[in-house]
Amino acid sequence: MLDNQLLRENPQYVATQLLKRGFQFDAVTFSQLEEKRKALQVSTQSLQNERNLRSKAIGEAKSRGENIEPMREEVNKLGAKLEQQKTELDEILKQIEVISLSLPNIPHESVPVGKDELDNQEIRKWGDVPAFSFPVKSHDELGEALGQMDFALAAKITGSRFVVMKGHLARLHRALIQFMLDIHIQQHGYQEIYVPYIVNADSLLGTGQLPKFEADLFKLTGDNGYYLTSTSEIPVTNTVREMILSAEQLPIRYVCHSPCFRSEAGSYGKDTKGMIRQHQFEKVELVWITKPEDSYNALEQLTQHAEVILQRLNLPYRVVALCTGDIGAGSAKTYDLEVWLPSQNTYREISSCSNMEAFQARRMKARFRNPDTNEIQLVHTLNGSGLAVGRTLVAIMENYQDEHGNIHIPDALKPYLGGIDIISVK
């Protein structure tokens, strides 16, 4: 959510900035609603004051034994008019709230202006793209040939966009989770956190998934209004909702492993084969809560921490700055890490690292006390995948395959697999 004061005082500036995203904000209509709100608030307060004075006068007249019926009728008329204006004011406030909750974040000035992913800017590359002397296979071809990845069985159990993994591939998938957690906890200093995988609407509103992106979520039946979490960013970030932190507590740096559940609405026909885009997948998430002045340094650190995982696994990747037309609605600035997939002969996203600035904090009322001014200020929130586990498995399978369809284990993962150094076709 954007700053209400900014929206009220300079809606045209907001409209200009959001237009960089391709988002149309009707500043004129918003300004008209604001003028109505201000007029109604002044009028309502005036009527309230007048009714209070008249009510007091009735009490005084009654104590003197005077006829108070005419005065009471006037107060009743004032009361009816007051209730009518309160109803009108509530309706205006609801309209303003609906607009406010629909607005995306203002992009940071350093974000490249562009329309879509074609306008994203490559920042750096790491690692050499492997040169194979044989026709490469995709991860799903490799996994099925190994007899350890079964999409047809998953479809029978549930439906499309699910997978069953067995044997060493399932073990490798689990090893990746532990490896990522160990690096982030032991070397990067994150605190591990375990959170619910089911969240309520308030949490989703706080991090910005609701009301705009409900179609992307799996909602549970029943009266609780619960949803399966689409990313642990949601429950982890909401741990500071409605809190006033001390400056000494910041930055907070959490790492969390969780399954994620997404409906993939709008993804019809995209990545229909394999594990690239699934309804259920695992992720190791990094979340930072910082002071405003520290958040952009934090974004660089968070991104580098995610990069370390790819470097330890010796997977070629690149870092891309998303343009204004491609960044998520709540993000002020985002770096994507894209790993090389030989079967597609291209880089594919494996992590998004974002600075949300105060966008989520304003929704969550997540604040801290500034020791210099003693004022209560909004924190900044950041998040990034460190990494998406399934896509990391995909990248290992494809980059570490040999001509026989075997998968060689990266050196960094061998201690997690009890000495296994190759997953072989039988």
From Swiss-Prot:
Q: Which residues does the annotation say bind ATP?
A: R262, S263, E264, E349, I350, S351, S352
One GO biological-process annotation of the entry reads: seryl-tRNA aminoacylation
Which amino acids does the record list as binding L-serine? T231, S232, E233, E285, S385
Report the CDD domains cross-referenced here. SerRS_core (cd00770)
Q: Which UniProt keywords apply?
A: Aminoacyl-tRNA synthetase, ATP-binding, Cytoplasm, Ligase, Nucleotide-binding, Protein biosynthesis
Q: Which reactions fall under this protein's catalytic activity?
A: tRNA(Ser) + L-serine + ATP = L-seryl-tRNA(Ser) + AMP + diphosphate + H(+); tRNA(Sec) + L-serine + ATP = L-seryl-tRNA(Sec) + AMP + diphosphate + H(+)
Q: In which pathway does it act?
A: Aminoacyl-tRNA biosynthesis; selenocysteinyl-tRNA(Sec) biosynthesis; L-seryl-tRNA(Sec) from L-serine and tRNA(Sec): step 1/1
GO CC annotations?
A: cytoplasm
Tell me where in or outside the cell this protein is found: Cytoplasm
Describe the subunit structure. Answer: Homodimer. The tRNA molecule binds across the dimer.
Q: What does the UniProt record say this protein does?
A: Catalyzes the attachment of serine to tRNA(Ser). Is also able to aminoacylate tRNA(Sec) with serine, to form the misacylated tRNA L-seryl-tRNA(Sec), which will be further converted into selenocysteinyl-tRNA(Sec).
Q: Give the domain note.
A: Consists of two distinct domains, a catalytic core and a N-terminal extension that is involved in tRNA binding.
**Name this polypeptide is given:** Serine--tRNA ligase
